[in-house]
Structures are given as C-alpha cells and as structure tokens.
C-alpha cells in the first residue's frame, strides 16, 4: 500500500502546522483562492502518492535540470513525498537492466493508475534507431508504457512540439508525443525548458484534484499559459510609450527600454515567465537584458533569427507597427496633457471664485 503525502511528511517529523502551511503555499503558487486550501489538505491526507514513470527520448535533459530547481514546491518534496517517482533513468539510483526491471514491475502493479511523464521525443525514421533505450528503440518503449498510463505529461518543447531536433529538414523525423500517442489524455507543458514551478505546479494540481487543469486549445494548462509574456512584462510601459532598444549597446538598452525591435518574441509567446519568473522568482530573460526567443511556442526554432523583430502583429492589445507606437504615444500623451491642463485651469478658476465669494460674505 502506497503511503499518502501526509503520512510521509509525518514520518519525516514534519508538524501538522507546517503541513497546513505547505498546503496554503501550494494553493497560492497555483493561483487558487483560500477556499481551495481545505481541498488540498484533504487530498494530501487521503490520496495515496501517485506512481510516476518519467521517460527520456531525444532531449538535452534541460527539463529535468529545471524541475530539480523548483522553489515551491521543492523538487525533493515532489519526488520523495508527493509522488512515487519509480522510474527516471536520470534521477534514479538503479541503471541498466535493474532500471528496466523496475519499469516493468511498476507497470504491472499499477496498471491504469500511473502517470507517464515524457521528456524529449521519439525519432520515427529508420525504425526509431536514432534513440535506443535498453537495446530497443525509444518509440517502442514509449508506446509500451503509454498503453496502460492513465494520463501523459509532455515536458518541454521537445515532447510538446518537436523542438530543435525536429528542425528542418528533420532527418531523424523527430515527432512530438501527441502525434504518436493518440488514444490517451495528454497535457503539454512547453518551454525550453519549462519553468520549474510550472512543472511542479502541474503535478501538484493533478495529484490534488485527480484531473488535468483547464487546458487551452493546444493542450496547455491555462493557469500558466493563458497570457503572453508581453501582457505582464515590466518593460510594457516602454512599449506603449514608443521607447525601444535599437541596438544592444545604445542608451535605450542601458535605460531598460522595450526589446521588441531587437527581436523580443514576448508579444506572441504564451508563458508565465514575466509573472512566475525563474530561479525562485529571481528574474527572467527580458529582465536580464535579452529578448524572449519564444521557446514555448510551436516552431520557434524554424522562424528565423532570434534577433529579427516581429512585424505586422495582428493580436488584440498589440500595435501592428512599432514605428507608429511612438508617434501615437506622443499624440495621446499630448492630448492627455492638454486635457489635464484644461481641467486644472477650470479647478483653479472655480477655487478662486469660491474664495472671492467667501471673502465678500465675511465682509
């Protein structure tokens, strides 16, 4: 019998107070209101830890590198307490035939009740021989493990979209997971890599409510991918004011102006970078002075230079041409300034008249 998350925490000497605090912080990190805290507490107390099998295909392990750096919940809490991570050839102690034996045992014991997490993708060309796991093509392992999984998580842009190994002309025919496994519910968590707290947040939500979070039409969780980076970017006021960096060493760059003209893809990229940020909420690429490359969007690797600016963006809330933004902004600011001056003048006149009337009455 698998222990519940609460039982594991108590066994580790964690107090009830600390457990409740953890549940409250978890609700906050997921963007949930306080009314959900009792539900999280109940789930952590009663639901057994879910077995998770984590496979690796064609990838660079950046998703795992991001995952283990999660600040809340901590990766150690997720791996050692919240879930039962029974197979991950990068993190597990066993290797070789021992590791593959564990995979088979878990699949048999928890048939239909385990979550399959996939990092990377399978190559289909040459019968999948470009990626071999345990002496067999990864595509065979993927199909075998997916067969009895209750849900599948596609970690990162490799599993979600194909990423750089699927770049033209894609000689290995690297293929995203949803185009290979078509009969299972799949949640995509794109990014190269995804934000650590987004990864642990998705797992926490699934374990707590025993379902996927609400997904957008591309299969991404809306709680993390419903807004463009541009929408909450701290440099957005500079965009609206027509203040842009023209080259990397100009005065505008030193002042922290908008990076749109030097290739920032924030206006077309849906992710939580500008709100959740990276390294425990410390920063994100735009804050560090480099434009967004759109790494969570499908096909970003084949859309030209990262430093070529977007043109003719036709989305709500985005001006079609950055060159006209400054002119428009000047006009708006000028009109607003004139209106403000007129209102101020009227108020001063009224105040002066009122003062004169008061003085006359006192006489």
Curated annotation (Swiss-Prot):
Asked if Cell membrane is a keyword of the record, the answer is yes
Q: What class of enzyme is it?
A: oxidoreductase
Q: Which UniProt keywords apply?
A: 3Fe-4S, 4Fe-4S, Cell membrane, Iron, Iron-sulfur, Membrane, Metal-binding, Oxidoreductase, Signal
* Residues that, per the record, bind [4Fe-4S] cluster 2: 230, 233, 258, 264
A molecular-function term among this protein's GO annotations:
3 iron, 4 sulfur cluster binding
* Domain of life of the organism encoding this protein: Bacteria
Tell me its EC number(s), please: 1.12.99.6
Q: Record's SUPFAM superfamilies? A: HydA/Nqo6-like
Recorded catalytic reaction(s): these are: H2 + A = AH2
User: According to Swiss-Prot or TrEMBL, what is its membrane topology?
Assistant: Peripheral membrane protein
Any single Gene Ontology cellular-component annotation: [Ni-Fe] hydrogenase complex
The protein's matches in Pfam families, at most eight in alphabetical order, are given as: NiFe_hyd_SSU_C (PF14720), Oxidored_q6 (PF01058)
Q: How is it modified after translation?
A: Predicted to be exported by the Tat system. The position of the signal peptide cleavage has not been experimentally proven.
Cofactor detail note: Binds 2 [4Fe-4S] clusters. Binds 1 [3Fe-4S] cluster.
InterPro entries per the UniProt record, alphabetical = Cytochrome-c3_hydrogenase_C, NADH_UbQ_OxRdtase-like_20kDa, NiFe-Hase_small_C_sf, NiFe_Hase_small_N_sf, NiFe_hydrogenase_ssu, TAT_signal, TAT_signal_bac_arc
Mention one GO biological process in which this protein takes part, according to its record.
Answer: anaerobic respiration
Per the similarity annotation, which family is this? Belongs to the [NiFe]/[NiFeSe] hydrogenase small subunit family.
Main role? This enzyme recycles the H(2) produced by nitrogenase to increase the production of ATP and to protect nitrogenase against inhibition or damage by O(2) under carbon- or phosphate-limited conditions.
Write down the NCBIfam families for this protein, in alphabetical order: hydA, TAT_signal_seq
Name of the protein in its database record: Uptake hydrogenase small subunit
Source organism per entry reads Alcaligenes hydrogenophilus
């Amino acid at each position: 019998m698998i222990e519940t998350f609460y039982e594991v925490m108590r066994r580790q000497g964690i107090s009830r107070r600390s457990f409740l605090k953890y549940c409250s912080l978890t609700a906050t990190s997921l963007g949930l209101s306080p009314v959900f805290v009792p539900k999280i507490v109940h789930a952590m107390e009663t639901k057994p830890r879910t077995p998770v099998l984590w496979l690796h295909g064609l990838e660079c392990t950046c998703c795992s590198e991001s995952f283990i750096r999660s600040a809340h919940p901590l990766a150690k809490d997720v791996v050692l307490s919240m879930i039962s991570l029974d197979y991950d050839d990068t993190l597990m102690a066993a290797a070789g035939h021992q590791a593959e034996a564990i995979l088979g045992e878990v699949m048999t014991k928890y048939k239909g009740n385990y979550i399959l997490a996939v990092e990377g993708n399978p190559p289909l060309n040459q019968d999948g021989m470009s990626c071999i796991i345990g002496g067999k093509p990864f595509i065979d392992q993927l199909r075998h493990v997916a067969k009895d999984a209750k849900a599948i998580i596609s970690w990162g842009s490799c599993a979600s979209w194909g990423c750089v190994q699927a770049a033209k002309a894609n000689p290995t025919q690297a293929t995203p997971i949803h185009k290979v496994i078509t009969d299972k519910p799949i949640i995509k968590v794109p990014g190269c890599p995804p934000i650590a707290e987004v990864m642990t947040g998705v797992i926490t939500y699934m374990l707590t409510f025993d379902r996927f979070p609400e997904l957008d039409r591309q299969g991404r969780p809306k709680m993390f991918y419903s807004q463009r980076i541009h929408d909450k970017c701290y440099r957005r006021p500079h965009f609206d004011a027509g203040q842009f960096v023209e080259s990397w060493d100009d005065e505008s760059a030193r002042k922290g102006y908008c990076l749109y003209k030097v290739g920032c893809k924030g206006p077309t990229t849906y992710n939580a970078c500008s709100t959740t940020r990276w390294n425990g909420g410390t920063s994100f690429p735009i804050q560090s002075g480099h434009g967004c490359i759109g790494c969570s969007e499908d096909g970003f690797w084949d859309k030209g230079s990262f430093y070529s600016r977007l043109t003719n963006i036709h989305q709500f809330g985005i001006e079609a041409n950055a060159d006209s933004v400054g002119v428009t902004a000047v006009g708006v600011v000028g009109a607003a300034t004139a209106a403000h001056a007129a209102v101020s003048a009227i108020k001063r006149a009224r105040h002066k008249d009122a003062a004169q009337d008061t003085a006359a009455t006192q006489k």
